[in-house]
């Protein structure tokens, strides 16, 4: 009896936690939740739910960095000034989310469990390419929700240990995966953030310089995009910033970000810059 049970467990074993849920409890997947026809049918009004906005990522001399603002919007209303949109996926990769906040955060948690499950089953880390591909498959699974207006568009970045460099990947709503060089941004303020990144980024940045570039690009995005929140000295709210190097992922402390944001604001005030 015990041997039979063990054989059944072995036969159903998979290194993918998402695949395990799909086989056994598909209703637990974030994108397998049915919506009433009144909410999704023809002529229905779009759901008013919080949306996460701008994420930026860039490579530098020692690895890769990702940063996100702290604002979530719901139509023309600020839904939150405290939301976090950048998360560690595992010890050597980070994930930033733009789009429907609730679904994006659930997908992030599922992705974190997916990588942890793989490591426990296989006894080794999944390669960076493998992580990027699995995230793409999850986004593709969310396509029916995206077609109902509940899209999730992530940025993924990590340190490729065998190669010894930081890499970053963007996605579309169908799960298409695209490796980006140098820097990238997603979300409502991404057009303005990319413009700033093009001017500020250069090869061989130090980690400190990369943090300053990321914060200033978010500052520029917030200046022109009402859905993006800039550094807020009054509330002491700063972007969420992670660096990923050979030593692993690390969150930049708020006191460091306060100094960086303060220097940017002071420089622009001194220069009397209008924009």
From Swiss-Prot:
Pathway: Protein degradation; proteasomal Pup-dependent pathway
PROSITE patterns: PROTEASOME_BETA_2
Propeptide stretch(es), residue numbers: 1-52
Reactions mediated catalytically: Cleavage of peptide bonds with very broad specificity
Principal cellular location given in the protein's record: cytoplasm
Cross-referenced PANTHER family: ATP-DEPENDENT PROTEASE SUBUNIT HSLV (PTHR32194:SF0), METALLOPROTEASE TLDD (PTHR32194)
Name this protein carries in UniProt: Proteasome subunit beta
Organism the protein comes from: Arthrobacter sp. (strain FB24)
């Amino acid at each position: 009896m015990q041997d039979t049970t063990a054989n059944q467990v072995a036969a159903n074993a998979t290194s993918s936690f998402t695949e395990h849920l799909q086989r056994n409890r598909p209703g637990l997947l974030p994108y397998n939740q049915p919506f009433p026809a009144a909410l999704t049918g023809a002529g229905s009004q779009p759901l008013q739910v919080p949306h996460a906005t701008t994420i930026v990522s860039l490579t530098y001399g020692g690895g890769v960095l990702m940063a996100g603002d702290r604002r979530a919007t719901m139509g023309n209303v600020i839904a939150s000034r405290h939301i976090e949109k950048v998360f560690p996926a595992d010890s050597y990769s980070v994930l930033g989310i733009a789009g429907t906040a609730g679904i994006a955060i659930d997908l992030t948690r599922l992705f974190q469990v997916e990588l942890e499950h793989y490591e426990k089953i296989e006894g080794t880390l999944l390669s960076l390419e493998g992580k990027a591909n699995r995230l793409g498959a999850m986004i593709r699974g969310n396509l029916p929700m995206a077609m109902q207006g509940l899209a999730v568009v992530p940025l993924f970045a990590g340190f490729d240990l065998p190669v010894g460099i930081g890499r970053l990947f963007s996605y579309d709503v169908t799960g298409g995966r695209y490796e980006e060089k140098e820097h990238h941004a997603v979300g409502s303020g991404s057009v303005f953030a990319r413009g700033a990144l093009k001017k500020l980024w250069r090869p061989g940045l130090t980690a400190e310089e990369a943090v300053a570039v990321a914060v200033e690009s978010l500052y520029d995005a917030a200046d022109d995009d009402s859905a993006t929140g800039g550094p807020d000295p009054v509330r002491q709210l700063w972007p969420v910033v992670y660096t990923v190097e050979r030593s692993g992922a690390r969150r930049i402390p708020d006191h460091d970000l306060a100094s960086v944001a303060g220097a940017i604001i002071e420089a622009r005030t001194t220069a009397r810059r209008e924009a």
